[in-house]
Amino acid sequence: QLGLVARQAWMLGRGIQPLLCFSEGRTFRVSVRMRRHLQPGEEHRLGLLARCEACGSQVVQILKNLTGWPSCCCPSGAGRWSVSGPLWIGPLQDLQTLAALRGDPWLQEPGAISNRTKRLLERLEADPGSPATVWATDELARRLGGGGPPSLNQLVTAVRQAGFQAY
């Protein structure tokens, strides 16, 4: 979605700045600030995501600087890349906007926003929205041989303890 918005804005000589992005089930919510002009390097925020169907390796390439895809983690020749895009590969959240929302005196009033919305803002502020790679919990469960997807909190904790980013 952001990739399409960016391409449309660029055709008009405008730039974009994602303010916040999140999903509610199958619905994606995106808030974008339109800019009068492209910002330096903005064109490097559109790219392709390749994912190996066998081993799950993921690689991102900037659309402007495409090269050949590297080998995945599969034994020689066993893997196959599935390429998606063009996609927005830049940040999905603007931390200043999120901090301003959380610090707004009106939102501090009792009942101004729900606890669920407060938690969402906290999660968005903690998640920079990059890199542009992702794993679905049901796929992780399938690959690990579990009976079903693990609890999201347990999964995030385990991934962080292993030294990786998870939100």
PLM segments and residue spans:
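SAM-dependent transferase fold signal centered on methyltransferase-like domains
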Residues: Q1-Y167
